[in-house]
């Protein structure tokens, strides 16, 4: 024991730390396990003074062992503290005191069951400072008593094993989707049993893919297959959520029964939930797969009269206006009813929500400043909405010779519906003094694409497709090229090269 206490582990600096511990007071140690606690003066406090004034370890042991009726739990920390002070002043105790230290240790071990929790903690702390080994009998006994006083841990609730569809649902319900990469989702889906893939789980998967722009073919094909297999059990409100990622991610599934299945569901459910029906058609519009029969139903007077006055009336009319535009531009063979003119509303009268939410990350202000310095503020329009309601990033009017024309002298809008036959176009050119070309600069920001790919989102591809069919010339500005421009001079040079590639020229007539 002496060798342990005087080893390198018990350095003078460590023992001197005992001097910084304030004297242990009975009132701060709390009641002992048996509930006794000294009050006031008397033999108990007299014994504490004797311990504090002891001149050797033997004297400490004598006061503790010869006064069993007066010794209380708080006296043992006092004795340990005094022992440390004596070891500092007498670094080499005599061989007789080695046995004394062992006896003192055994005395504490025998009586520690009566210590309160606070006394046990103080004794543990002092014993460590004195250098008692961690695997020695004193520290082991004190540590065992400390653990026995801890409140019992509540039994952990039984967590059943999570398999297949349940694990997929847990992953999809987590707000931090990056914790669950697509490989995890694919594996969970592959391990799921057919009965575990409920509509709720598949809707969560579809919403997850659409929200985070994950164009993952394996997962999308699984949704398409589920829709075909469960066709009879699904209503239009569930189907609209299942088909959402296909339109948003511009992905046409390989499942051959996908479109026939949707046409049957639309025929069965079209009059039940008008908004769900139109939402399904919106997704199919982005895929360029509009079924004529469903269009005839939603453009019928009975359907339009049914939605008027209902809460979703405005949003349904906006979607119907977009569907009517798609019929006009993309379905020349359609002969059914169309949306009446009085029911039409602007499709997208302002920048999309995602663009407004991420405006501080957009390159639009930078491009606008470059165009202002390159062309002049009067020679372009920003955020101009053209019929039938598409918001353009930047619009220019260019003469047949390639000169950029001032916007104040031009009508920025092309006629809608566009003139389709050559005779109408010839009549238009002969009666119009300004055959200027309308050029739309399209910003393609990072969030306009599916994640980790070069496929435009369905709504972006639809807008560009319709503007092109209406006669506007499109000039895409990809985010990779914009991000590589360092400073305004480089950006102006980049824009000049882009415009010159379309036949623009700078001279007396233009910018």
Swiss-Prot record:
SMART domains: RAP
GO terms, biological process: apoptotic process; regulation of mitochondrial mRNA stability
Mutant phenotype after disruption: 60% decrease in mitochondrial NADH dehydrogenase activity.
InterPro entries: FAST_2, FAST_kinase, FAST_Leu-rich, RAP
One Gene Ontology CC term in the entry: mitochondrial matrix
Record's catalysed reaction(s): L-seryl-[Fas-activated protein] + ATP = O-phospho-L-seryl-[Fas-activated protein] + ADP + H(+); L-threonyl-[Fas-activated protein] + ATP = O-phospho-L-threonyl-[Fas-activated protein] + ADP + H(+); L-seryl-[protein] + ATP = O-phospho-L-seryl-[protein] + ADP + H(+); L-threonyl-[protein] + ATP = O-phospho-L-threonyl-[protein] + ADP + H(+)
Gene Ontology terms for molecular function: ATP binding; Fas-activated serine/threonine kinase activity; protein serine kinase activity; RNA binding
Domain RAP: 439-497
Cellular location(s): Mitochondrion matrix
Signal sequence segment: none
Alphabetized Pfam families for the sequence: FAST_1 (PF06743), FAST_2 (PF08368), RAP (PF08373)
UniProt PTM comment: Autophosphorylated on serine/threonine residues. Activated by dephosphorylation.
Entry keywords, A to Z: Apoptosis, ATP-binding, Kinase, Mitochondrion, Nucleotide-binding, Phosphoprotein, RNA-binding, Serine/threonine-protein kinase, Transferase
Principal location listed in the UniProt entry: mitochondrion
Enzyme Commission number: 2.7.11.1, 2.7.11.8
Family statement: Belongs to the FAST protein kinase family.
Reported function: Phosphorylates the splicing regulator TIA1, thereby promoting the inclusion of FAS exon 6, which leads to an mRNA encoding a pro-apoptotic form of the receptor. Required for the biogenesis of some mitochondrial-encoded mRNAs, specifically stabilizes ND6 (NADH dehydrogenase complex subunit 6) mRNA, and regulates its levels.
PANTHER family according to UniProt: FAS-ACTIVATED SERINE_THREONINE KINASE, FAST LEU-RICH DOMAIN-CONTAINING
Record remark on domains: The RAP domain is essential for RNA-binding.
Name of this protein: Fas-activated serine/threonine kinase
């Amino acid at each position: 024991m002496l060798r342990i206490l005087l080893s390198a582990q018990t350095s003078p600096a460590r023992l001197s730390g005992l001097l910084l511990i304030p004297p242990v007071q009975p009132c701060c140690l709390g009641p002992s396990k048996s509930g006794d606690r000294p009050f006031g003066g008397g033999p108990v406090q007299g014994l504490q003074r004797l311990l504090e004034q002891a001149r050797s370890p033997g004297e400490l042991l004598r006061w503790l062992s010869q006064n069993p009726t007066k010794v209380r739990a708080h006296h043992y920390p006092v004795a340990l503290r005094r022992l440390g002070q004596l070891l500092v002043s007498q670094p080499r105790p005599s061989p007789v005191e080695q046995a004394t230290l062992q006896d003192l240790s055994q005395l504490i071990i025998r009586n520690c069951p009566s210590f309160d929790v606070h006394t046990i903690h103080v004794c543990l702390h002092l014993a460590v400072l004195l250098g008692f080994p961690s695997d020695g009998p004193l520290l082991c006994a004190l540590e065992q008593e400390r653990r026995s006083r801890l409140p019992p841990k509540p039994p952990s609730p039984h967590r059943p094993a999570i398999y297949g569809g349940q694990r997929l649902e847990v992953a999809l319900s987590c707000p931090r989707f990056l914790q669950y990469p697509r490989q995890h989702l694919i594996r969970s889906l592959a391990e799921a049993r057919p009965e575990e893939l409920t509509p709720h789980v598949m809707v969560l998967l579809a919403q997850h893919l659409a929200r985070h722009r994950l164009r993952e073919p394996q997962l999308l094909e699984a949704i398409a297959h589920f829709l075909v297999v469960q066709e009879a059990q699904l209503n239009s409100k569930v189907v609209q959520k299942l088909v959402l990622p296909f339109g948003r991610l511009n992905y046409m599934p390989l499942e051959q029964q996908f479109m026939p299945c949707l046409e049957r569901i639309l025929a069965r459910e079209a009059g039940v939930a008008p908004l769900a029906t139109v939402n399904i058609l919106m997704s199919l519009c982005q895929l360029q797969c509009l079924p004529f029969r469903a269009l005839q139903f939603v453009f019928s007077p009975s359907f339009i009269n049914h939605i008027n006055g209902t809460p979703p009336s405005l949003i349904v009319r906006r979607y119907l206006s977009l569907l009517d535009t798609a019929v006009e531009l993309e379905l020349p063979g359609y002969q059914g009813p169309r949306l009446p003119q009085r029911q039409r509303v602007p499709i997208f009268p302002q920048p999309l929500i995602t663009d407004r939410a991420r405006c501080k990350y957009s390159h639009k202000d930078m491009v606008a400043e470059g165009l202002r310095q390159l062309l002049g503020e009067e020679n372009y329009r920003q955020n101009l909405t053209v019929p039938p309601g598409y918001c353009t990033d930047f619009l220019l009017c260019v003469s047949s010779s390639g000169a950029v024309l001032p916007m104040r002298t031009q009508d920025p809008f092309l006629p809608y519906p566009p003139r389709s036959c050559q005779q109408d176009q010839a009549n238009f050119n002969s009666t119009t003094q300004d055959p200027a070309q309308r050029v739309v600069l399209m910003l393609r920001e990072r969030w306009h694409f599916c994640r980790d790919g070069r496929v435009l989102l369905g709504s972006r591809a639809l807008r560009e497709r319709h503007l092109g069919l209406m006669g506007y010339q499109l000039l895409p500005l990809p985010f990779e090229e914009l991000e590589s421009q360092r400073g305004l001079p480089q950006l102006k040079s980049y824009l000049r090269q882009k415009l010159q590639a379309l036949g623009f020229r700078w001279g007396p007539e233009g910018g």
